[in-house]
């Protein structure tokens, strides 16, 4: 098993009873904690028209997290490009890179990050933006590239910042685009596990080396709930599981406290949702996490794992990330001792 990095994905979720400000404060606390633990990056996802998330203005959240952390890379996971002008995105992230050099990531996605009615309000007349994703990614690459590749319209700040750009996806289409452009590819297996194997194969087999990247670079996003015991992990995972049920029953709400015997309380339909959508979810104690990480990596060989953990108590969420980091560090410590 090759060495891999680990990172964090967040939507700046609100717990039951929290205000938006409290949700953002919790996101800052999490970011500070994983920064101190040595995680590589933390990304924030763009979602709209949900009172359960505080990450709609993703650029503002990224800037706030950058200002409150020291070493960890911070970025979008991602900016939903059809909702935005490529020039404005380049200017925004060029500004962030100017203020926080070598700490900013720009991951780009094609989805709306919301329901269709909200997407209509955001995009107005730009309903075909999803079909121009590849072209608009290229536009951003140019805007943050060298002066020699610029056209008449330029991004200030932006030119020469070379903000690292990633392609997000949960389908084979996004894999093809990432491969063609020679960019790192982040696959959303946390909610769309079924096409990951095919998408990663397409990306790796069709990857074209570029000035940005010489070899394929795969980031796999998975769910991880870690605790000191299997029983505790099972208990605190109830909040995370409820999120996915809410998403796919169109009933999204704030994170709720976990309850005993959660799975036994679910309907057959709700159990089927979890079975179909949570294929890449690792829950358990240290040994379970270690074993399932090894199994996952032996199958997919990701260069990096970016982890989502929806846990009601912030202290338990931070502990989950701490356990995960310790497990991964121990894996590679033993690996080095065996060489």
Swiss-Prot record:
Please give the InterPro entries that the UniProt record associates with this protein.
Bact_Lucif_Oxidored, CmoO-like, Luciferase-like_dom, Luciferase-like_sf
Q: Which GO terms describe its molecular function?
A: oxidoreductase activity, acting on paired donors, with incorporation or reduction of molecular oxygen
Q: Which domain of life is it from?
A: Bacteria
| Pfam families linked to this entry | Bac_luciferase
Q: Which residues form a coiled coil?
A: none
Q: Which PANTHER family match?
A: LUCIFERASE-LIKE MONOOXYGENASE (PTHR30137:SF6)
Give the family, as the similarity comment puts it. Answer: To bacterial alkanal monooxygenase alpha and beta chains.
Official protein name in the record: Uncharacterized protein YddN
The organism's lineage is: Bacteria, Bacillati, Bacillota, Bacilli, Bacillales
